[in-house]
Amino acid sequence: MRGSSKIYEWLRAAMLAGPIVLAPLDAVLADCKPDHFRPLFFIKSMGACAFDSETLSFAGTPAEQATCLMRGMDSSRNLEPRLQGLPHALAERVGKTNGLPLRATLSDYLPMLGLEGELGDFLWLPVSRAHDNDLAAPMARYFVIHDTSGPNFGRRSFPDDIDGGGKVNDLRNFECHDGWGKAHVVISRTGELLLVHDYSTPWRETKFEQAAEFGGALKGLFLHNEMIQPRRSAPGRGRRNDARSPDPPFTAAQYDRIALLYVIASVRAEHWLIPAFHAAIDAQIPNGHDDPLNFNIDNFANSLDAVMAKLGTPDQVQAAHQ
């Protein structure tokens, strides 16, 4: 897992002993905090899924919220219709508190994947809370899935190695030494992870969360997960559009990792979080996003089932130790 223990220790040592240089990528020590004033941003509605600022949730049951929030954009960049239902792996879990694996089980499992690093170190901490970690506010409810929407190759073909090594999957491109990385976690197409912020850190990435109407109320309510997806321009959409994704849009390794992260985040929240797409959250905001483009919900559900099969249910784990 890139950006876990080693990177953390390097950066901590740097703060104590002075600056370090990790050449040749300037991005490793890039400043990511905006260097210009951002005016207040106002929204005209509570979004396509009807957010309630009093309850800090979208309309409906958790499962109903997921059918609204797990929608992408169609070819005309309009939000797709609400899902008719959720795959069984999600329908039986979203919003519920039962069926979560034990933290100890996850702690034993992560080293098998080489992911003990910060994922294991912080496993015993809760997730963030709304209102910038106000202890009286609700814990994070939404597990937001994004894609990086880049690099954009324009009219050029995708490189042959986009699902392997190469610059596209170099997670150092997403490291920020000033602590202003966009998401909590970034997932490469090979399944490597970069932990940018732990899930206990309140963070905002969507325009909706940053709207002036909310102040800081939504900071900590959403957990953000970026999946690397390069783009190309599609014919008839303007010279610099990024409307084409690779084939496959996301790799099996990415689905496996996003499912694992969903399990980890839900265990730490002590309830199954509500999955959401960036596109649906910002759907009614000008210049909103289309990500995660062509995300396959069934693949995500299948990976979730596979992860849970490896972890077992709490009852199965207890029975195995009797």
Predicted regions mapped to residue ranges:
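Basic/polar, cationic surfaces and motifs that engage anionic cell-wall
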Residues: 2-3, 8, 27-109, 223, ...
